[in-house]
């Protein structure tokens, strides 16, 4: 193990000088034992000097301090010992429960599985959330993105999916909190504990208050733990909240390293950085990784380079809309903007496919008629259009659903709706079976039977 000296410190960027014959490689981890800091090599500047990003605060670090090259990238604990534990980017426990006691450590920089090792995902994953199961069904071993601006419910949707899938699914889950609020991480830990699923979840946190190096690498730490479970032949769930903060940390690091910014100030290698992470999140013939990623959309602009780069890698996109949230319809999923590769009659069956397309065309027609209604009123519409508007408003309300994780705030118990009940309910609405039922009966209920019961109560 070679050692060198620190020659310059500018915030999170540290330059270290090594003997020329033992220059550290890119991504090698360097240790500053005096302050217990780890650095990751990002650039070789020549003349034996390497430029590093600090994986922690550089307070107390000064010029001339000795740095040791570990000769390998950052490595983290993997395996079942990580379950029920909270770790940071370096794999150190931060839950005050003592050492992890791992039998194996893996480097966080790994190659993506080769083409011949990868497996296609066609098996449906039921979530119990009507709008998702109907409009943008998830595949087991697929990649899903939850897109939304500030405060439209990405994290709540993510928590509900974790609750529904992780509790119903008996496999292991990994949660990577990338640059999100510490409070949310704390709430999530306690929620898992109360649901008795903590012993099946590994938690990796690099929250908002951490230096950019931690936030950039914490997603790779979580992914490495998930890859180990996958390579043991398991079906793993990987939750990442939030991919945008991963991009943002990359932007900060890129600026600190002096790279020229590209569009909207993002790093010039945005697509490559996103690809490095996303290409590793994949299923192999041994096991599967089903990943659900929250993606913050800056200023509600889906064409921003960060969300736009993420779209290309996903199998299903769930777009949360502020307009729908303003109507009080939660989950605020936009049924006309959300898509899934699984939406194919050969995968989901003809009944599901036909129902989804009819629901979407009804909502699309309602969207077109809204301007006419706003100017001329409902009376100017043809009888057929009036019927479409009435059904579309019922569909819109029936797409809402009370969540288990929001019980504390709403006071109404959460609902898990099986896929067959979801299809039957929406098919009935578009077929006109419930034309005589008032639209408010469809709001915030589970299955169609609950809507009919609510209608009876409203009529009484």
Curated annotation (Swiss-Prot):
GO molecular function: ATP binding; ATP hydrolysis activity; proton-transporting ATP synthase activity, rotational mechanism
Membrane topology listed for this record: Peripheral membrane protein
Catalytic activity, reaction form: ATP + H2O + 4 H(+)(in) = ADP + phosphate + 5 H(+)(out)
Keywords tagged on the record: ATP synthesis, ATP-binding, Cell inner membrane, Cell membrane, CF(1), Hydrogen ion transport, Ion transport, Membrane, Nucleotide-binding, Translocase, Transport
Keyword Nucleotide-binding among record annotations: yes
Parts forming coiled coils: none
Subcellular location(s) of the protein: Cell inner membrane
SUPFAM superfamilies per the UniProt record, alphabetical: C-terminal domain of alpha and beta subunits of F1 ATP synthase, N-terminal domain of alpha and beta subunits of F1 ATP synthase, P-loop containing nucleoside triphosphate hydrolases
Entry EC no(s): 7.1.2.2
Enzyme category, top tier: translocase
Subunit organization: F-type ATPases have 2 components, CF(1) - the catalytic core - and CF(0) - the membrane proton channel. CF(1) has five subunits: alpha(3), beta(3), gamma(1), delta(1), epsilon(1). CF(0) has three main subunits: a(1), b(2) and c(9-12). The alpha and beta chains form an alternating ring which encloses part of the gamma chain. CF(1) is attached to CF(0) by a central stalk formed by the gamma and epsilon chains, while a peripheral stalk is formed by the delta and b chains.
Family recorded in the similarity comment: Belongs to the ATPase alpha/beta chains family.
Family matches, as HAMAP family: ATP_synth_beta_bact
Protein name, entry field: ATP synthase subunit beta
């Amino acid at each position: 193990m070679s050692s060198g000296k620190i020659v310059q410190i500018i915030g999170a960027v540290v330059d270290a000088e090594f003997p020329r014959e033992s220059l550290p490689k890119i991504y090698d981890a360097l240790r500053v034992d005096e302050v217990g800091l780890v650095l990751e090599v990002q650039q070789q500047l020549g003349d034996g000097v390497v430029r590093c990003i600090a994986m922690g605060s550089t307070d107390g670090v000064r010029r001339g301090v000795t740095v040791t090259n570990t000769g390998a990238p950052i490595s983290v604990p993997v395996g079942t010992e990580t379950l029920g534990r909270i770790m940071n980017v370096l794999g150190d426990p931060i839950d005050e429960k003592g050492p992890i006691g791992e039998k194996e450590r893996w480097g966080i920089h790994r190659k993506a599985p080769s083409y011949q090792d990868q497996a296609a995902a066609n098996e449906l994953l039921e979530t119990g959330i009507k709008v998702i199961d109907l409009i943008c069904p998830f595949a087991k071993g697929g990649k899903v993105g939850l897109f939304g601006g500030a405060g439209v419910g990405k994290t709540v949707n993510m928590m509900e999916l974790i609750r529904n899938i992780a509790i119903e699914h008996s496999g292991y889950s990994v949660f990577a909190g990338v640059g999100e609020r510490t409070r949310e991480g704390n709430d999530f830990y306690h929620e898992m504990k109360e649901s008795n699923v903590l012993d099946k979840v590994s938690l990796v946190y690099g929250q908002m208050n951490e230096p950019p190096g931690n936030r950039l690498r914490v997603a790779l730490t979580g992914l490495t733990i998930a890859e180990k479970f996958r390579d043991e032949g398991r079906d793993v769930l990987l939750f990442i909240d939030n991919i945008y903060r991963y991009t943002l940390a990359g932007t900060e690091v890129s600026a600190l390293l002096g790279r020229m910014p590209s569009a909207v100030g993002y790093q010039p290698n945005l697509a490559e950085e996103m690809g490095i992470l996303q290409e590793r999140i994949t299923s192999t013939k041994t096991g599967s990784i089903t990943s659900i990623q929250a993606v913050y959309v800056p200023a509600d602009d889906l064409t921003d380079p960060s969300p736009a780069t993420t779209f290309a890698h996903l199998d299903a996109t769930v777009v949360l809309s502020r307009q729908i949230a303003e109507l009080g319809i939660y989950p605020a999923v936009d049924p006309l903007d959300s898509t899934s590769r699984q939406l194919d009659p050969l995968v989901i069956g003809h009944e599901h496919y036909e129902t989804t397309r009819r629901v979407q065309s009804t909502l699309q027609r309602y969207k077109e008629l809204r301007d006419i209604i706003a100017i001329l009123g409902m009376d100017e519409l043809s009888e057929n259009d009036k019927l479409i508007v009435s059904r579309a408003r019922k569909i819109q309300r029936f797409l809402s659903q009370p969540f288990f994780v929001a019980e504390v705030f709403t006071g109404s118990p959460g609902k898990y709706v099986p896929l067959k009940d979801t299809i039957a309910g929406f098919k009935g609405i578009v077929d006109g079976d419930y034309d005589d039922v008032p639209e408010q009966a469809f709001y915030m209920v589970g299955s169609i039977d609950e809507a009919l019961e609510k209608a009876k109560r409203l009529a009484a």
